[in-house]
């Protein structure tokens, strides 16, 4: 009897040991499957991001941005809808990721060992560094040891860890972490001279410089680091595997390159004098012509039409070139006759004709070119003629590229000026390098208008919120006194 009792106790112990060994694995596996299934069941992928001109923004009531488009493509591969969750800073974003309130964090987030310990990371898809920004015409510090005034950073604990390491080399280094303002808002305050220094992501600084040329870069405080999406730190292997496969495919198909070209390609070019002149023109000259650009935009974004006009004439209705093109859209006599206008120096006639001519050029393009890219091809034709655009597409195909892909054709435009290439083309020599720069300038000018107005609207919204808060506080004070 005693032996039977011992055998039962031993068997139960072994059973409990087996459950203890197996159950956690079963639980984790169940949790993993539940999470991935939950995304499918709810029919939505929750992606957290930060509202700025690169990652995510609203344009004409539509969601836009590098991270938005990439996340939308990922959601499509999962067969679910995308729901973006917007946060002010990285710590808010990571806190929600920690709580599993979002499935992914995507906001051009740099790699940091602390974050890698806290979360799982997706494949690298870009790179950036942390830079010290200061206001142009102020003294430029050579290193952190020369910084004598306050350095501001947004709410980013990983960046603080980096600064603590640098503090060992520069003991006098101090900084202020602002939890109320976004990184973009800090950079805007720096541009206005309200604060002396900001440490920010190199991508965000380059983007803001396009509308705030007063911003200048003192130096990089870190080497370039990879940019990743982050996932919650639990066994999300199905989602992580799907993300890995998606990113590999995005690299192979050119999706990543196309998004980098669309959202980051223009910010690498920065000229202080040109940008300062342009921003002055946006503030002082554009308002008198913007109603006409909106009136005659047709299927185009009016801000693109405005950007073309600035590239052509700097919004000068009386502009005339040595070759005889005239007006705010710089039309030739032949184009004016084709578009049936009588006075090229009349802004309304010129803008109407320029828009109609661009629409006509777009209609001449093959349907195989994606809708979103057709305008860039049309602008090349606007600049150097439809024949030379045909040559550029043919040359791209001959060189093994895709003649319907703007990124492929764009890089071959300068070859139209090289004899070994143009001698084999139907329409011969063309200043393709000028057409290349022409389109790049227009894209940059258009994005600057979009982001100038976006920043203005955000500031107005914030001012209104502050005013409402102040009024509420006064009312509460009055009630307390009564």
Curated annotation (Swiss-Prot):
Residues 457-470 have a biased composition (Polar residues). One of its GO terms (biological process) is cell wall organization. GO terms for molecular function: peptidoglycan lytic transglycosylase activity. GO terms for cellular component: cell outer membrane. Residues 268-482 are annotated as: LT domain. It is a peripheral membrane protein. It catalyses: Exolytic cleavage of the (1->4)-beta-glycosidic linkage between N-acetylmuramic acid (MurNAc) and N-acetylglucosamine (GlcNAc) residues in peptidoglycan, from either the reducing or the non-reducing ends of the peptidoglycan chains, with concomitant formation of a 1,6-anhydrobond in the MurNAc residue. InterPro entries: Lysozyme-like_dom_sf, MltF, Solute-binding_3/MltF_N, Transglyc_AS, Transglycosylase_SLT_dom_1. SUPFAM superfamilies: Lysozyme-like, Periplasmic binding protein-like II. Residues 473-482 have a biased composition (Basic and acidic residues). Keywords: Cell outer membrane, Cell wall biogenesis/degradation, Lyase, Membrane, Signal. Residues 19-267 are annotated as: Non-LT domain. The active site is at 312. It is an enzyme of class 4 (lyase). It comes from the Bacteria. Residues 1-18 form the signal peptide. Its EC number is 4.2.2.n1. It is found in: Cell outer membrane. It holds the Pfam family SBP_bac_3. In the N-terminal section; belongs to the bacterial solute-binding protein 3 family. In the C-terminal section; belongs to the transglycosylase Slt family. The N-terminal domain does not have lytic activity and probably modulates enzymatic activity. The C-terminal domain is the catalytic active domain. Murein-degrading enzyme that degrades murein glycan strands and insoluble, high-molecular weight murein sacculi, with the concomitant formation of a 1,6-anhydromuramoyl product. Lytic transglycosylases (LTs) play an integral role in the metabolism of the peptidoglycan (PG) sacculus. Their lytic action creates space within the PG sacculus to allow for its expansion as well as for the insertion of various structures such as secretion systems and flagella. This is Membrane-bound lytic murein transglycosylase F.
């Amino acid at each position: 009897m005693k032996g039977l009792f011992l055998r039962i106790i031993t068997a139960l112990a072994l059973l409990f040991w087996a459950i203890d060994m197996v159950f956690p694995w079963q639980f984790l596996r169940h949790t993993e499957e539940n999470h991935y299934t939950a995304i499918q069941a709810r029919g939505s992928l929750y992606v957290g991001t930060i509202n700025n001109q690169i990652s995510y923004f609203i344009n004409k009531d539509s969601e836009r941005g590098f991270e938005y488009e990439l996340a939308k493509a990922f959601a499509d591969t999962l067969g679910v809808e995308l729901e973006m969750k917007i946060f002010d800073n990285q710590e808010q974003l990571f806190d929600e990721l920690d709580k599993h309130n979002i499935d992914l964090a995507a906001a051009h987030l740099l790699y940091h060992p602390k974050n890698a310990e806290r979360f799982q990371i997706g494949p690298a898809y870009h790179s950036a560094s942390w830079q010290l920004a200061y206001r142009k015409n102020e003294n430029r510090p050579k290193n952190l040891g020369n910084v004598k005034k306050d350095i501001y950073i947004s709410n980013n604990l990983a960046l603080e860890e980096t600064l603590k390491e640098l503090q060992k080399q520069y003991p006098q280094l101090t900084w202020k972490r602002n939890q109320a303002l976004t990184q973009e808002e800090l950079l805007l305050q720096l541009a206005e001279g309200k604060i002396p220094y900001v440490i920010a992501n190199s991508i965000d600084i380059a983007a803001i410089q396009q509308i705030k040329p007063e911003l200048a870069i003192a130096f990089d405080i870190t080497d370039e680091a990879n940019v990743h999406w982050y996932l919650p730190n639990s066994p999300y292997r199905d989602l992580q595997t799907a993300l890995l496969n998606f990113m590999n495919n995005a690299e192979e198909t050119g999706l990543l390159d196309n998004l980098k070209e669309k959202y980051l390609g223009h910010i690498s070019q920065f000229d202080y004098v040109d940008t300062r002149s342009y921003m002055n023109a946006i503030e002082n000259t554009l308002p008198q012509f913007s109603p006409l650009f909106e009136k005659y935009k047709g299927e185009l974004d009016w801000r693109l039409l405005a950007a073309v006009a600035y590239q052509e004439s700097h919004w000068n209705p009386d502009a005339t070139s040595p070759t005889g093109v005239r007006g705010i859209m710089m039309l030739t006599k032949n184009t004016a006759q084709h578009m049936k206008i009588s006075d090229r120096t009349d802004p309304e006639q010129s803008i109407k004709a320029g828009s109609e001519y661009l629409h006509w050029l777009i209609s001449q393009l093959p349907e195989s070119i994606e809708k979103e890219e057709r305008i860039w091809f049309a602008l090349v034709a606007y600049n150097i003629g439809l024949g030379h655009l045909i040559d550029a597409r043919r040359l791209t195909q001959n060189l093994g590229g895709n003649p319907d892909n703007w990124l492929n054709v764009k890089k071959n435009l300068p070859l139209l000026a090289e004899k070994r290439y143009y001698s084999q083309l139907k329409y011969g020599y063309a200043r393709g390098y000028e057409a290349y720069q022409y389109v790049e300038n227009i894209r940059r000018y258009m994005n600057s208008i979009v982001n100038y107005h976006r920043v203005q609207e955000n500031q107005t919204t914030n001012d209104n919120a502050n005013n409402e808060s102040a009024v509420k506080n006064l009312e509460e004070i009055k009630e307390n006194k009564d």
